[in-house]
Amino acid sequence: MSSAPNASALMKIGQLKKPYGIKGWLWVFSETDDRTAIFDIKPWWMKTATGMKPLTVKAWRQQGTGVVAQFEQIPDRNVAETMNGVTLWVEQDILPEPAEDEYYWSDLVTLRVINEQDEYLGDITEMFETGAHAIMRVAATSDSLDKEERLIPWHKQTVVKVDLTEKTVLVAWPSDY
């Protein structure tokens, strides 16, 4: 068994949800664009109360609009019921480089968000999916324009420019919206 990786070298790729059936299968929420691409990335690590533990996919399939999976470490429904909410991680260095104008969400979290009026709105604290598109949660900081938290869509009409070197995202988003 391999030793647990350094937490700072990990990227969250999904989360285990409620059990499916009686044989230890679980619904899997994938944070990858293609929901099934998560199964092409190995090895997985799960974050537990006692630290990072390996998690090995035994089988998976699409089920309705979601995805379910069975794992070596989860033998039955009783164990599966304790896994709801467990987050799934992979080592960042095994992931392919993103294409031009594509980003891993983990690379966007902590970036400064500035609008076209050159107003600093805050820092990205979270990226999440709504179904229609991704959303940036932008939290105020001590030196941002105001103390407002903003939910800004990650969309080509909203995101003007991303500069990972400068750690900024330029958005077409007025401060009073």
Curated annotation (Swiss-Prot):
Domain PRC barrel: 100-177
Keywords: Chaperone, Cytoplasm, Ribosome biogenesis, rRNA processing
Disulfides per UniProt: none
Origin: domain of life: Bacteria
A molecular function GO annotation: ribosome binding
Gene Ontology cellular component list: cytoplasm; ribosome
Gene3D superfamilies documented for this protein: PRC-barrel domain, RimM
Keyword Chaperone attached: yes
Homology family: Belongs to the RimM family.
Subunit annotation: Binds ribosomal protein uS19.
Domain notes: The PRC barrel domain binds ribosomal protein uS19.
Name of protein: Ribosome maturation factor RimM
Organism: Psychrobacter arcticus (strain DSM 17307 / VKM B-2377 / 273-4)
